[in-house]
Design a protein with these regions (language model features):
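Active-site loop/oxyanion-hole signature of alpha/beta-hydrolase fold enzymes
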Residues: 87-127, 276
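Short beta-strand/loop motif that positions the catalytic acidic residue
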Residues: 222, 228-230
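Conserved loop-alpha-helix segment in the C-terminal half of the alpha/beta-hydrolase fold
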Residues: 77, 232-270, 276
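Post-His helix in hydrolase/transferase enzymes
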Residues: 275-288
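Conserved HGGG/HGGXW glycine-rich cap/lid loop of the alpha/beta-hydrolase fold
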Residues: 45-95
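Active-site nucleophile elbow and catalytic-triad environment of alpha/beta-hydrolase enzymes
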Residues: 203-218
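Flexible "cap/lid" loop of the alpha/beta hydrolase fold
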Residues: 134-142, 148-184
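Alpha/beta-hydrolase fold catalytic core
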Residues: 2-58, 82, 291
Length: 291
């Protein structure tokens, strides 16, 4: 007999995720200050960005409930040694104000484009983690000429790309799970309007629990080289991940033909959040792929 998934089981799963976020918050604090930062007007609101280093541009998109520092704090110093790094905080996250505008992947991708326009960046490499990876997929779909190379870290373009227990955990999120963890302190430290905390959580929880699918056909049309990085136990359905790689032209026998331009890396002994903490591993993959 299959054991029924009780509400307390989901609560425990969410609590574990929150503890992992706490680990990231403590370990991945920002190490260097940006050379430039500011806001870009978007649809009656504004989006916050930070710029580091010089060279070919790479845009970094964080995961749900993260900030730039939490998500990219350890990688930015490495990437900015040779690249111009543009890190963006998506709607409601970090310094970017809460907005009543409905969250959609097309609207978030459009926000990224507006930051690119503002900074006079015609095209760039784009890297996204978790929700940020889904936004990066959408950006590549709707504006392919703006993405030179795409890096997807522990992310998917559809709800079905996650294992069932992960999607169930998304549905079980509640604002109170976040209040007693460092999320609140991190939010209060930088949010323009601290009174929007609960509304922000409610909006993000609803978005995280809403099924989505950017379309197999759209993924198959992507012409930019794509690097997919996944932890072997990061919650992604690895059968679906293999199908995604095949849609991108991978999963072939390179002994019988040319090596595909898109790559897949499975990092052993890593979960969803712990994968982002493997700075040397990720920096090595990105350096090789983005040459």
């Amino acid at each position: 007999m299959k054991r029924q998934c009780k509400g307390s089981d989901v609560s425990k799963a969410v609590l574990v995720v929150a503890v992992l976020f706490f680990t990231v918050l403590r370990s991945n604090g920002q190490q260097i200050k940006p050379a430039d930062s500011g806001y870009v007007p978007v649809d009656g609101n504004k989006v916050y960005y930070e710029v580091y280093g010089d060279g070919k541009p790479i845009i970094l998109l964080h995961g749900a409930f993260f900030t730039i520092g939490m998500n990219w704090g350890q990688l930015i110093p490495e990437l900015s040694k040779q690249r111009k790094v543009i890190a963006i905080e998506l709607q409601g996250h970090g310094h970017t104000p809460y907005s009543d505008r409905k969250l959609t992947f097309p609207s978030l991708a459009a926000d990224v484009e507006k930051v690119m326009d503002y900074l006079k960046i015609d095209s760039a490499d784009v890297a996204g983690f978790s929700m940020g990876g889904s936004v990066a997929y959408q950006l590549t779909i709707q504006s392919p000429k703006r993405v030179r190379k795409l890096v997807i870290i522990s992310s998917t373009y559809k709800s079905g790309g996650w294992r069932p227990e992960v999607t169930n955990a998304f549905k079980g999120f509640k604002p109170e799970f976040f209040t007693n963890f460092p999320f609140k302190a991190a939010y209060d430290a930088v949010a323009p309007d601290k009174t929007k905390w609960t509304k922000y959580l409610e909006q993000m929880i609803a978005f995280a629990g809403t099924p989505f699918d950017l379309g197999d056909a759209n993924i198959a049309k992507i012409t930019s080289p794509v690097l997919i990085i996944s932890g072997d136990n990061d919650g992604l359905d690895k059968i679906e991940l293999a199908k995604t790689y095949q849609l991108l032209g991978g999963g072939l026998s390179a002994d019988l033909g040319p090596m595909p331009k898109s790559h897949l890396a499975i990092v052993p002994s890593q979960g969803h959040v712990s994968l982002m903490m493997q700075t040397k591993t990720l920096a090595g993959y990105l350096e090789d792929f983005l040459k």
